Amino acid sequence: MSRTVFCTRLKKDAEGLDFQLYPGDLGKRIFDNISKEAWAEWQSKQTMLINEKKLNMMNVDHRKLLETEMVNFLFEGQDVIIEGYTPPSK
């Protein structure tokens, strides 16, 4: 049976994550307050950030930058801005 959470990002009740995907207190906060849909949105943005900014996940500073962007996206309602990226037109 799936869990329902009030998603902080989407501002609605939605299906919650099946298990904690991120370590520590932040991981618990994500598990309790972020839906699968919002997490999938973040994963897409995260991939873009890593690729466009050429981030190295072995670099502590790059991981901190990604974590800051994640908190801003999931909890502060800020979108990820990548310099030079133009979304495809419909």
From Swiss-Prot:
GO biological process: cellular response to oxidative stress
Stated role: Could be a mediator in iron transactions between iron acquisition and iron-requiring processes, such as synthesis and/or repair of Fe-S clusters in biosynthetic enzymes.
One GO cellular component term: cytosol
Matches recorded under InterPro entries: Fe_traffick_prot_YggX, Fe_traffick_prot_YggX_sf
Domain of life the protein comes from: Bacteria
Keywords: Iron
Family as reported in the entry's similarity comment: Belongs to the Fe(2+)-trafficking protein family.
Protein name, as recorded: Probable Fe(2+)-trafficking protein
Gene source species: Photobacterium profundum (strain SS9)
Gene3D superfamilies named among the record's database cross-references: Fe(II) trafficking protein YggX (1.10.3880.10)
Gene Ontology molecular function: iron ion binding
